[in-house]
Amino acid sequence: MTKLTVAVAAAWLIAGCQHPKAPARVTGFQERAQEAGIAFRMHDLPKEQGEQFHINLYDHGSGLAVGDYDNDGREDIYFLNQLGGNALYRNMGDGSFVDVTAKAGVALPGRVSVAATFADYDNDGWEDLYVTTTRGGNVLFHNRGDGTFEDVTAAAGLRYVGHSQAAVFFDYDNDGYLDLFLTNTGRWTTDTFDSATGAYVGKADLGTTMTTPREFNRLYHNNGDGTFTDQTDRAGLRGRGWAGDVAVFDYDEDGFLDLFVPSMFGRGQLYHNSGHGTFTDVTAQTLGRTPYGAIGSKVFDYDGDGRLDLFVVDMHSDMWMGLDAQHLSLETARRTQHQRFLSPLGPTVDETTPGFTTTVRALFAKLGEDYNTLLFGNALYRNLGQGRFTETAAPAGLETLWPWGVATGDFDDDGNEDVFITSGMGYPFYYWPNQLMMNNGDGTFRDQAAALGIEPPTGGIYLEEKVGGKPAARSSRSAVVADFDGDGRLEIVTNNFNGRPYYFANRFPRRNYVEFRLTGTKSNRDAIGTVVRLWAGNKVMVRQVSPAGGYLAQSTRVVHFGLGDRSQVDSIAIRWPRGIMQTLRNPAINTLHEVREPAR
C-alpha cells in the first residue's frame, strides 16, 4: 500500500504556493483552522520510526468524523491520528472549537487510528463512536450522555484486530437498529510492535502488499440489546478484500439499502440487498466496468434529475506518475490530468505499444482480475432509473489526478451539488492541489480551487520537516462537509497527512437555503437511509441521510438544500427507511427544521 515513488513538486505550483499566507478572498472559502482553535496535527508512523521508511508506513492517512456528541445542536469534529492520539473538538457555536478529548476519553494513544463514525447504535438519543485501527483492534465507544464515552467493544461483540478502514452504520434489514459494515484491506503487517526498533512489524518487502492474504469485510447485525452478531457469511458480504470505503444507497428504490464496495486493487462490487438478510453482486449488469484502484466513493445527485448517482475516485491508477527516475512524468501529468488511460501505466504505454494487450491482460490475470471489468480513472455513474447506470466521469469533467477523499455539498447554495476532492501524495515529496469542482448546473463541473480560496495552501506546499533529507509536500487525505456555524453555508474540513488540518470557512455571498435534521422513531433514530426530495417551481432536488463515506470520513447528516434566488419551497417528500412517506408543504426557508418520523 505504501508508494515509494519519488517526484518533485511542479514549478508552476511552487512559484505561487510558498507565500506564508494565502490572500483573503471576498467570495469562496477562507482557511481558518488556527483562528477556529483547531490545534490538532496528524502525525504518521515515521515519527515513531525515525526518518527511515518501513514497509509498515501507512501512507493512506487518517480520517475524521462529524457528529453532535453532546446534543447541543452544533456539529463537533473528531480527528484520527496514527501517532499520539486522536482529538475531539467541541463546536462552541461562535466559529470556534475547544479540544475536549481528555474529558471525553477518546484519544486512543498507542493505536494507529484510521477512520471513525458517529452513530446512535442503541437508539438512546446520544451519538456513539466507532473507531477503526491497524494496531490493537477497533473500538466501540458508548456515549454516556455526560460528555464522556465508555469502551464497550468486547461487551458489544465487536472485537476485531486487523487492518480495518471504513466503517458504516446502516439498517440493512429495516428493523430500526443500525447494523455495522466494516471494510478491511490485507495482512500487510502483523499487530506486533517491536520496542527495540520502534517499528510496527511489517512484511518483508513492498511487493507483498498486493498479493498478501486479504482481510475480508465484516457485516455485524445489531441485536437490539447493545450487542452485535457477525452475519458476514450468511449475507454474502466477505467481498474481495482491499476495500477502503463503502457507499450506501437504495439504488433501485426497493426499500432496502444496497452497498457499493470499491477496491484499492481490483474491481469494485455493487451488492443488491434482497431484503431477506442476503446480498448479491450485481456489478456487471448495473455498473459495468469499475475503477481498478478506487479509494473513495460518494452518493449524490450531480445532474439534478432527482435520482441518486454514484461517484468513485481512483488513486492507484495514477501510480505511473513519478515512477521515472528523471521525473519527466510531472509535466505529462499536468498536461493529461483530466484524461483516462488504458492501464495503471498511464500515458507511458497504449494500445499501439507492442505486446500491450497481451502483457496487460496477463498481468491482471496473474492478480486474479479480468481486465475487461476494469477502468483506470474516476467513475461517475449516472442513475438512469430502474437499476440502470451509465458512466460519465470524463464528459462531466470529474476525471482528476491523485484523488483520495471526496465530499459533496451545495457550497454556493445555487441548487446544484458541488464536489471537493482531496489530492496529492505528500510522500514521496510530491504536491498536487485539492480540487474544488463547482457544478455548472448542466451535468458538468469546473475546478475552481484556486479562484475560490482552496489553493494555494496556507503556509506553502511543503511541511516543516524533511524525510530522508528531502522536503515532504502537504497532502490532504479525507474531507467532511457541515454547516458548522449555522449560517446556512457549508464549510469543508480536511485531515492532512502528517500535517495540520484545513478548516475552510464558507465566504460565499448568502443565498436562500433550507435544512432538515431528521429523527427516526420507527426507523433508526439517526434516520440513516432516509431520502428527501424537494420541489421548488420546476426544480427538483434529492438528498440522502448518509452514514460515513467518501474515504475515512463522515460528513453531516443534516440535509441541506441551496435554493439560490428561489424564495419558497413548494413541498418536501421524505421517505423514511421503514417505508413511511411524509410530506411537508411550503416549509419556511433560511432555517433549520427539526423533523420527527410520524407514526404512519
Ranges and model annotations:
Residues 3-16:
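Bacterial N-terminal signal peptides
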Residues 17-32, 46-50, 396, 427, ...:
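Gly/Ser/Thr/Pro-enriched helix-cap/hinge segments flanking short amphipathic alpha-helices
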Residues 22-30, 85-100, 137-151, 192-207, ...:
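Beta-propeller blade repeat segments, especially FG-GAP/WD-type strand-to-loop junctions
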Residues 29, 74-81, 126-133, 180-184, ...:
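Hydrophobic beta-strand segments that make up the repeating blades of beta-propeller
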Residues 38-63, 105-117, 157-168, 213-215, ...:
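Repeat-based blade/solenoid architectures
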Residues 61-71, 90, 113-123, 142, ...:
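Beta-propeller blade termini
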Residues 103-117, 134-172, 182-210, 214-215, ...:
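Asp-box/WD-like beta-propeller blade repeats and closely related beta-sheet repeat scaffolds
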Residues 185-212, 316-373, 421-431:
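Short, conserved, GDST-rich strand-edge loop motifs in beta-rich repeat architectures
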